[in-house]
Swiss-Prot record:
Gene3D superfamilies: S-adenosyl-L-methionine-dependent methyltransferases (1.10.150.290), Vaccinia Virus protein VP39 (3.40.50.150). InterPro entries: Methyltransf_25, SAM-dependent_MTases_sf, Trans-aconitate_MeTrfase, Trans_acon_MeTrfase_C. Belongs to the methyltransferase superfamily. Tam family. Its EC number is 2.1.1.144. The gene is tam. One of its GO terms (molecular function) is trans-aconitate 2-methyltransferase activity. GO terms for cellular component: cytoplasm. It comes from the Bacteria. It is found in: Cytoplasm. This is Trans-aconitate 2-methyltransferase.
């Protein structure tokens, strides 16, 4: 798959950073010496962590060279490593593992989450936020267009769900705070919705298509978006975007 586009991702930087800040606000840790930012992207979440814990040793981990290049410029005080989050292991146990809008791309959370918990110190915290929007029209319509035009399903798997996450985490010996929030982002047009998802959810669908095929796909996708997302009285469009959060503390 082609590398991520940091500029496109940060086109809606404020909207993407807000859930990161709200996840951070629910972490009840004062003294943090070592922490990981898994799937750190262009460093927007890493900057929040540095502001909260300026004396901590912060390591950002991502598998995108382009994102890491941007992150090193944005937050030069922190260390960044190119690695697969499933295989990366810190040199020693850490106080906090923070993963904002990244783990939804990683398969098999039933194995992944116990592994991540094992990397924490006792009383350490795993804090996670993930888009939970595969059943929203924005993503359902991608699958519909692919089916219409004869392309394979390249959608990511749905998240296991709140009850499954609660069981996975409590069975690994964690105290768990879990919640789900739906944001309503103001979009200026239906094309703006396409611009938003082009940086993330639409990427797998576009990767294997020719330029002509991409244009045909996006033209039909735009037609269906117009049918599903009404224009408000002031000309704006509200894009519903559910996100799932949890903060899990490893109990002694």
């Amino acid at each position: 798959m082609a590398d991520w586009n940091p500029s496109l991702y940060l086109q809606y930087g404020a909207e993407r950073t807000r859930p990161a800040a709200e996840l951070l606000a629910r972490i009840a840790l004062d003294d943090v010496s070592d922490l990981l930012d898994l799937g750190c992207g262009p460093g927007n979440s890493t900057a929040l962590l540095l502001k909260r814990w300026p004396l901590a040793r912060i390591t950002g981990v991502d598998n995108s060279p382009a994102m890491l290049e941007q992150a090193r410029v944005a937050v030069p005080e922190c260390r960044f490593i190119e690695a697969d989050v499933r295989q990366f292991k810190p040199e020693h146990a850490v106080d906090l593992i923070y993963a904002n809008a990244s783990l939804q791309w990683v398969p098999d959370h039933y194995a992944l989450l116990p592994h991540l918990i094992s990397l924490l110190k006792l009383n350490g915290v795993l804090a996670v936020q993930m888009p939970d929007n595969v059943d929203e029209p924005s993503h359902v319509l991608m699958r519909e267009v692919a089916y219409e035009q004869g392309y394979p399903n390249r959608a990511r798997e749905p998240l296991p769900g709140i009850h499954a996450y609660y069981d996975i985490l409590t069975e690994t010996g964690c105290d768990v705070d879990i919640w789900r929030t739906t944001y309503y982002h103001k979009m200026s047009s239906h094309q703006a919705i396409i611009d938003w998802v082009s940086a993330t959810g639409l990427r797998p669908w576009m990767q294997e298509l020719s330029e002509h095929e991409q244009l045909k796909f996006l033209e039909r996708y735009h037609e269906l978006l117009v049918q599903q997302y009404p224009i408000q009285e002031n000309g704006q469009i509200l894009l519903a975007f559910p996100r799932l959060f949890f903060v899990a503390r490893r109990e002694p």
